[in-house]
């Protein structure tokens, strides 16, 4: 009787283990590769980005480098176009990496000096290490003074160099 019970138990264990195996499925390939979300938000993944405005001001002051603040929205087509042009421009990426503290924000800060002509996106504002907002460094539009478009990369590069020159003559 005991042998019969053991054989039934053994058969049941074998059946349950055979039936309990998961089906072999091939992993489905994702149609679109998702890029991990970093502080760069696509503006330059190899760059070191500050996380908050306060942290950026601290880095700017301690490293004696100007701060470049980029205001944008993830779902804004103008912001997306500027982001693509900014990320693909090797000169801008190199200058930003070597000589600037950089921060990109998808929200407004409490510092009203960062929106001298209104809150719109995309806009780029420069702040020197003495924490002075550089309102004199503007884009090419009179109604949105700090706005840049993908075609304005040469102007942005020129303004970045201007922010560095003023920094050296002011300090």
From Swiss-Prot:
GO CC, any one term: extracellular region
UniProt motif (Homodimer stabilization) ranges: 40-49, 55-62
UniProt GO BP: intestinal epithelial cell differentiation; positive regulation of cell-substrate adhesion
UniProt keyword annotation of Secreted present: yes
Protein's UniProt keywords contain Transferase: no
MF (Gene Ontology): identical protein binding
Cellular compartments annotated: Secreted; Endoplasmic reticulum
Pfam families named in the record: Thioredoxin_7
Signal sequence, renumbered to the chain: 1-20
Tissue: Expressed in most developing organs which contain mucus-secreting cells, including the epidermis, olfactory bulbs, otic vesicles, pharynx, esophagus, pneumatic duct, swim bladder, and intestine. Expressed in the gill, pharynx/esophagus, swim bladder/pneumatic duct, and intestine in the adult.
Keywords: Endoplasmic reticulum, Secreted, Signal
Oligomer and partners: Monomer and homodimer.
PANTHER family referenced in this protein's UniProt entry, alphabetically: ANTERIOR GRADIENT PROTEIN 2 HOMOLOG, ANTERIOR GRADIENT PROTEIN-RELATED
Similarity comment text for this entry: Belongs to the AGR family.
Stated name of the protein: Anterior gradient protein 2 homolog
Biological source species: Danio rerio
Protein's gene: agr2
